Amino acid sequence: FFPGAMSEAREIELAPIVAKVGALDLLIISPDDPEAMVRYSETARASKIPFAADPSQQLARMNGPEIKKLIEGATYLFLNEYELALTLQKTGWSDEELFSQVKIRVTTFGSNGSRIEEHGKPTITVPVPQELAKIDPTGVGDNYRAGFLAGLSWNLGHERCAQIGSLLATYCLETKGTQEYRFTKEEFLRRFQEAYGAEAAAEVSRHLHPRLSA
């Protein structure tokens, strides 16, 4: 692995970006140089910018205090089952203490689907669509989060967001290469309806563009 530009990520300032593009709806802090990740979260808290913490594989490189600084005050926290256990181990937090640090926690459980927890609301559990084949799991989590965040950008509810992410992750699982899958709008909606029903598919359909091609 060669970090390339990531080695200079800690030098990026968020303030000039906000000044240029305007207020941010949500800042996504994905796997990056750990020092940069913590710095972004500190800036987001100080500037009252909503942010999503998505530490992923960088949890292995971060210590407990760094993980705490990254997570505290996040609007969204994305973890898989292993990452959740690792976060609890390194921070010393209980599961309840961890959840209290964020507004919404999204946890994926592989073939057992995903869970969305939000304070004061019922927990949402979303199953995964039936896969056609299991070719390569690399990138499955990234695709889940991409689909989830796309749903957020379309102002969809968390259940729909998780369903979109789950189907996109399934396409990734069925393909060699993290972004090598192909599908048309019709193909995506057909599988989406099979997994989650006609009403859910109709809601998502309004946001998909015909330019999707096989």
Predicted segment positions?
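Conserved phosphate-binding/catalytic region of the ribokinase-like
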Residues: L26, T91-A214
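Short glycine/serine/threonine-rich phosphate/pyrophosphate-binding segments
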Residues: A36-V38, R145
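Conserved phosphate/ATP/ADP-binding segment of small-molecule kinases
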Residues: V38-P50, P55-T125, A133
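Conserved phosphate-binding/catalytic loop of the ribokinase/pfkB sugar-kinase fold
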Residues: F1-L26, P31
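Short acidic/polar capping segments at secondary-structure boundaries
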Residues: A5-E8, L26, D32-A36, S56-L59, ...
